[in-house]
């Protein structure tokens, strides 16, 4: 077990997966900080974060400040006399007064290859950009947004059909290992830090729901990258109309590139293959919709959707932006 006393900051499942790995390897986590409970989706009841649930199950002291700058919270942190703070997808900015508390500083696990994709959505943005390699970067935090010196990097390939959710799982599964290595280097005095090359920096801001609206007037490869990048959240969607009725929202849960590249049609046109596949024409090529969710209904495969729309070849059309 490492002798370092660690306080862990994190909130979503990504952070819970990493924390569980640290605990499995006997990292001395003496306290956990997570965001306050918030209602999720249709539930009006506050729901604890995955990190909170894990911390409580392990009987680890837990803090949930409304603001990380709260003076009482800062005094509580100081009372732990921690050696290191580890921050993984906490979800709030930590000011310098907090970063100065631990003996050896604060280290952040960033789910991207810094200095590229600084910000809240490195996983989604890199897939939307069509990159083939991502990874985790550990930085010693400073007051900037993901601008700290690099202490470690690990790499994860991005498969051609990988969604943001799948990449997040791969990165979180690897995150504990690189953090344990970092903590060991801090403990034995071999840690080194490399300044980021800011000339190579890019920003990855949080995605809006509107960015899930599929733009069919791009080549199919770019459309597919967009769909994968916003899956599962904020989610890919389009609008469709049927028999001159008002347009409705259609959520795209699973899709693929159409295997037949010789597909022609205006962007947004519906094409039904001989195998009863639901294809949507793009500027070049087409997207095959595998699993969808029409507005007001549950998720279904494309064949079920087509069976409910007679004369679909003539009267079903997807709106294009």
Swiss-Prot record:
Record has Repeat as a keyword = no
Q: Which UniProt keywords apply?
A: Protein biosynthesis, Transferase
Binding residues for (6S)-5,6,7,8-tetrahydrofolate: 112-115
| Superkingdom of this protein's organism | Bacteria
Q: Which GO CC annotations does the UniProt entry carry?
A: cytosol
Enzyme Commission (EC) number: 2.1.2.9
What PROSITE patterns has UniProt attached to this entry?
Answer: GART (PS00373)
Q: Per the record, what are the reactions this protein catalyses?
A: L-methionyl-tRNA(fMet) + (6R)-10-formyltetrahydrofolate = N-formyl-L-methionyl-tRNA(fMet) + (6S)-5,6,7,8-tetrahydrofolate + H(+)
The cross-references to HAMAP family, in alphabetical order and at most eight, read: Formyl_trans (MF_00182)
Function, in words: Attaches a formyl group to the free amino group of methionyl-tRNA(fMet). The formyl group appears to play a dual role in the initiator identity of N-formylmethionyl-tRNA by promoting its recognition by IF2 and preventing the misappropriation of this tRNA by the elongation apparatus.
Q: Which family does it belong to?
A: Belongs to the Fmt family.
Entry's PANTHER family?
Answer: METHIONYL-TRNA FORMYLTRANSFERASE, METHIONYL-TRNA FORMYLTRANSFERASE, MITOCHONDRIAL
Task: Output this protein's name.
Answer: Methionyl-tRNA formyltransferase
Look up and give the organism this protein is from.
Chlamydia caviae (strain ATCC VR-813 / DSM 19441 / 03DC25 / GPIC) (Chlamydophila caviae)
């Amino acid at each position: 077990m490492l002798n370092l006393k660690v306080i862990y900051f994190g909130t979503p499942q990504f952070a819970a997966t990493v924390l569980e790995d640290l605990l499995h390897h006997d990292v001395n986590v003496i306290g956990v900080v997570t965001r306050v409970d918030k209602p999720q989706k249709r539930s009006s009841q506050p729901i604890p974060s995955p990190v909170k649930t894990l911390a409580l199950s392990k009987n680890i002291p837990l803090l949930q400040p409304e603001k990380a700058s709260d003076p009482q919270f800062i005094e509580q942190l100081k009372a732990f006399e921690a050696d290191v703070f580890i921050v993984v997808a906490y979800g709030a900015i930590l000011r310098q007064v907090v970063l100065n508390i631990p003996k050896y500083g604060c280290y952040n696990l960033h789910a991207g290859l810094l200095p590229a994709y600084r910000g809240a959505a490195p996983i989604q943005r890199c897939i939307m950009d069509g990159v083939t390699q991502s990874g985790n970067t550990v930085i010693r935090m400073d007051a900037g947004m993901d601008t700290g010196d690099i202490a470690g990097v690990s790499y994860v390939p991005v498969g051609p059909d990988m969604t943001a959710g799948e990449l997040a799982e791969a990165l979180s599964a690897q995150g504990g290992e690189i953090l344990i290595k970092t903590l060991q280097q801090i403990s034995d005095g071999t840690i080194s830090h490399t300044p980021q090359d800011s000339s190579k920096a890019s920003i990855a801001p949080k995605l809006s729901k509107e960015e899930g609206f599929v733009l069919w007037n791009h080549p199919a490869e770019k459309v597919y990258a967009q769909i994968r990048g916003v899956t599962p959240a904020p989610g890919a969607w389009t609008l469709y109309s049927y028999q001159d009725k008002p347009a409705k929202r259609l959520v795209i849960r699973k899709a693929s590139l159409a295997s037949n590249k010789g597909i022609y049609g205006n962007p947004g046109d519906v094409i039904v293959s001989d195998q009863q596949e639901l294809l949507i024409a793009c500027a070049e090529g087409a997207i095959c919709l595998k699993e969808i969710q029409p507005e007001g209904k549950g998720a279904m495969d494309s064949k079920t959707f087509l069976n409910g729309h007679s004369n679909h070849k003539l009267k079903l059309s997807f709106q294009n932006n």
